[in-house]
Structures are given as structure tokens and as C-alpha cells.
Amino acid sequence: MSILSFPDRGKWGKSSWRGNCSGHIYRELFERLQPGVFIDPMVGSGTSVEVATEMGIEAYGLDLHSGFNAIRDSIANAVGKPGDLVVSHPPYGGMVIYSGKVWGDTPHPDDLSRCVDDDEFHEKLQLVLLNQRDATKTGGFYGTIIGDWRRNGTYTSYQAECIARMPKSELAAVLIKAQHNCQSESSSYRNMRLPFILHEYIVLWQKKGVSTLVLLSNLAHEQYARLTGTWKNVVRAILVALGGEAQLKDIYEAVAKSAPDKLVTNDSWQEKIRQTLNQNPSLFASSSRGHWQLAA
């Protein structure tokens, strides 16, 4: 069945942790996909890992609250082995503010619930998904649990944007997850003609045996007009994979090694990388000539 509904969240994790996903959802995924190794890069209160461990699955949970940053740190390096299933459940749209509210006393700059706008969120979540893909075995599955949001007359479909920003050749399934016990002000929806959103999506991709950079470069060519942030994420993904900093020549080499022929034969691709590095000081910093790193 592609529609999942579990009113009871189960015994796993913390019921007080707002936005926590029902453990029955994870159990359903594990029963279907039978992963030997499961990774959750945004584990929150630990529901997913508790379910996996109970089912005898080798599980790894990472999170901002334990010092792991899915935007800046390599999931593959942190875990030390690839996963059969790598699934995240990010905070989105500011509906549930994570850092400084659910966890910790102060806001975290890479907390996805604190993005300044949807554009920033879309770019950052794409980078997280690419990070998840890199940590997934060939033939394994990676994905995210995410919903939509309507506010101030604007409907944002986060799952549609995720699908548009990831390789269509790897999209494996979109499951609908019913939402229960949502916190909302009923008066806010009294005069609405359109229904209140009571569902999320579980979007799954199956990794094929090609590099993330090949897929990204294809996306850059196919959707250049729409995805202006793709080149930034190509360079960011390279720097994450190289440990957060690298010589310009090493960045070139990584692109040349992984990119398709139509990219490496383009006379301007090195110029595009330099342009991306130089025009985005909030993302990239140079400590010396030819040496680049992720901005603090």
C-alpha cells in the first residue's frame, strides 16, 4: 500500500518531541526494504534507530544535537560504512522550530527550520539528499519524509521541489503518510475553502552506480533555468567530500573525474567553478591563493 496511517505513534522516541514521526512508519519501511544497515542523519529523539535496533538492524543516528551537521559533514565519513537505507525527516517551513526550541538554547545557523526563505531551504535540503546518496550503497535506497505547507495564501510543495532537484532516473517511490494529532489553531482554518494539510510524503530514490557529480551535472544542463543553485551545490558537495577544504586544482580534478564528457569538454567549466567560488562568499572562503574551504 502506498498510503500509510498510524494514529498511535508507538513506544519509540519521545512523544514530547514535536514533529516526531510514528515508529510504525519506520517499521513499515524496514519490513518492506529489509536494510542491513540503516542511517538517519537527522535522528531527533531517536525513534528510527530504536525501531531499527529492535528489529535487529544495524543502525546509526546523527543529528545537530550530537554535533553532526548534515550540510557540512560527510555522512559516509561519520558512519564509516555505506547504508542500505538512509532516510531523513527534516524540520521544514518553520512549522516546528528545532534549534533553540525543541533542542538546545540557541538557534543553529544550519538548522533547516531556521532558513530565511524557501529558496534557502530547497538548496540546503538538496545538499543533504546528495550527502545521503553518497552514504548509500549502490542499489540501496535514500530518501526523506517531508510534507507541504500553506501560509499567507501560498502553498509550498516541498516534496515536489525535492523530486525536481534530484535525479529522476533514481526516483523509486512516493508514499503518503497520514498526519495525526497536528497542533494548529482551528480558527485559522475556519474560513478556508481548501482543506487543512494532514499528510506528509515519504520520497525514496534508489541509487544507481554513477557518481553524484555526474547526476548533478546532468541536472545542471537539463534544468539550468530552474535550478540556479546547482553549481553551488556541485562545488559544496566536492568540498564536503574532500574534508571541507581543498586546493583549486583538486576541485578541478574531482569534477573532471566524475563529470560527463559534455562537462569536461566545455572550455568554460573551470571558469564556472572559479566564478561560483568567488561570487558566493557566504558559502566559500579562500585562506590563500588557490586554497578554498567552506565558509564558517
What residue ranges belong to the model's regions?
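Class I S-adenosyl-L-methionine-dependent methyltransferase catalytic core
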Residues: M1-T276, S286-R289, L294-A296
